[in-house]
Amino acid sequence: MKTLKYTALLILIVSQSIFSQVVEGNVDNLPVKEYTLTIREEVVNKAGVAVKGMTVNGSIPGPVLEFTEGEYAIIHVKNEMKEETSVHWHGIILPNFYDGVPYLSTPPIKPGQTLKYEFAIKQAGTYWYHSHTMLQEQSGVFGSIVIHPKKETLVYDKELVLMLSDWTNEKPMNVLRTLKRGSEWYQIKKGTATPLNRVIARGAVGAQLNFWRQRMVGADIADIYYPAFLINGKQSVEYPDFKPGEKVRVRVIDGAASTSFWMTFGGEDPVLVSADGHDVVPVVKNKTFIGIAEAYDFIVTIPQDGKIEYRITAQDGSGTASAFLGSGKILAAPVVPRPDKIGMMQKMAKMDMKMGAHALKYRPKKDERFKIKNEYGMQMDMSKDSKMKEMKMDDMKHKQMDMPKDSAKEGMEMDHSKMEGMKMEGMQEEAVKADSAKKDSVEGEMKMEGMDLFSEYNYDYLRSPVKTNYSADAPVKEILLNLTGNMQRYIWSMNGVPLAETDKIKIEGGQVTRITLNNLTMMHHPMHLHGHFFRVINKNGEYSPLKHTVNVPPMGNVTIEFYGSEYGDWFFHCHILYHMMSGMARVISYDTPRDTRMKGFPVSELVAETNRYYSWGMVDAASHFTALQLTASNLRNQFNVSMEYGWNKNLEGEVTYERYLHDYLRVFGGVNIENEKEDSFDTFKTTAVVGIRYLTPYLFNLDARIDNELRPRIALGRSVMVFPKFSVFGYYEYKLDLGLVNDLPVAKDYTSDTVWSAGVEYMFSKNVSVMGSYDNRFGAGGGLSVRF
């Protein structure tokens, strides 16, 4: 009887949801709740340095927006900055026009303008808002949303919102530029680099060679150095007003730009009661992984004799932050150890796991997703759900099937807050009595050596209190998205194709879209779908949870599915901001007419943001030579300028254009200029050059070229970090003249020229190094390398 009640209620809710998406405005005369958010640039100090940030109503994070289910939200967003901005309401079901993705669904908010967002509140739970313009979220444009249900289903006395974030004192665009140039500085700065001396000490040379063979420096699981991780804008924050015995609903949101966290609690183990705004069957769980953009609610009991420490630990162990609930002595949270990156490399080597799938493949229009999946990564099903294991993966050609007349009634998204008859109190108490050690254990852990490497990153502990599955008769469209990336050039994509080189993923209303997310990288990827909740298929089958964001662990896979009940275009992307801005995104489209209010705001502007040019340079100022290198690069195109001047007055310069065919191979052409006599600038020789540049296995940079005098040249270079901050490098070049154009000396069949150098470098900072080298042209010397 209860199941029939919930099914009928679900049908009613979704029918209303579809209608409300088409008809905007407060047509039902709901009570109005109104806010004004003002975004401006201000000087802030979050990590010991005063820098420019972006505030919402004068603070970072912005204010908590509170609503009650059944209200009508009107939010005025005022832009007092000199650049455009936007606000996305993360996890909120609302009309497409107000979703807040500039140039896709919503106009950008230009400097000095105010945009009014308005939508009915049809759900309850913990959510958040943030800018969707470039990297503004990293600078501070984010805040939380709390929506109270019409009738509470949980028992607690008070509540607390904890917004997690990461903070950099650099300009976010400079951070991305540093990543694009392939710098290892962030790994060095936070102590997570794996130089050769540590690899040798651990007996992991074979594992390191295996990574190098696959063109990977190491098991990098986080990109960026952060001087501070924050909870509600502070590295440590106290909440002493909670009294002993009180039950507190702690609403946690990971609003970080690129950091997922492990969460641990001191005192009595908490009860996890909600995920991404949806109630789940309460489970006692202390150590919990929260991916970027996810939200989890816990019920914690304030102890009689102390205060609870809530601690977050960055996924790579590079930092922590704490909040304290209550007063008295500290009940410390368990410490999460730093990941063993060298140990990870060793385990993966034993598994003979193939990595290095292209982030930028040769033919972006060719469908090779199954080939990619079969060739790279973990060749096994990591899911615990038998239904997932039985899925047929051979019919993914996006066939269109007839929609059964009654399937629309059963294939809809759930609004958990409407289920007022659901009695969670008893389940909550039962969970409190459960044994936390058993609840936290990893079920079904693989016994083969190395196979448990990422087994703790799963959602099996999340179970919906009601069935979430769709009608068995509903047509299903299956999509495979391999998550691919390249750390050297910092390009992130799906199926080897970044956003700028792909078309929209078209879906239809009235069908189930099932997406398998197959991660072929060493990074976590929290994937967020705008405007929808999807089922995360886990061991709970029909009771799999509903979420708006799902974390896909390194070399693992997750399957999600959702019922098509919306209209318009919706963004689907990795919520690591720097990955999204580097191409790991798609547009999910119902292929409906574009809103006329978006005229003048082409979606090409959004796409272009992921294919920008980034430029950088370096100057070597040494006693025996001086060199300059300048680079400007986007996804496929790169321009290079280099000049070198030796102590013997040998001057050489070169300008080239490169076209990347895929991650590791590019063709190039350009002009080389060199003074004909080493000690004279009277005459210069100019030659045209064409060739290929290739990143070989084991990370050697190969340059093979020929000039307009038909003289071939080959060059090979490599750098290796031996100790933290300390690297060795070498370069070899061989040029041959067979006399095809030039006259050779008497009795010579050919002439050749060899250039080689070797040296060491010590990094003082991100931008300055001291170096010493020997060059067979210039001799030995030393000096500074300055990067900009």
Language-model region placement:
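Transmembrane beta-strand segments of Gram-negative outer membrane beta-barrel proteins
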Residues: 35-36, 481, 605-626, 634-643, ...
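Repeated loop/turn-to-beta-strand initiation elements of outer-membrane beta-barrel proteins
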Residues: 127, 570, 626, 635-640, ...
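Intrinsic, low-complexity N-terminal interaction/targeting segments
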Residues: 271-272, 277, 494, 503-504, ...
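Outer-membrane beta-barrel "beta-signal"
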Residues: 690, 757-761, 777-788
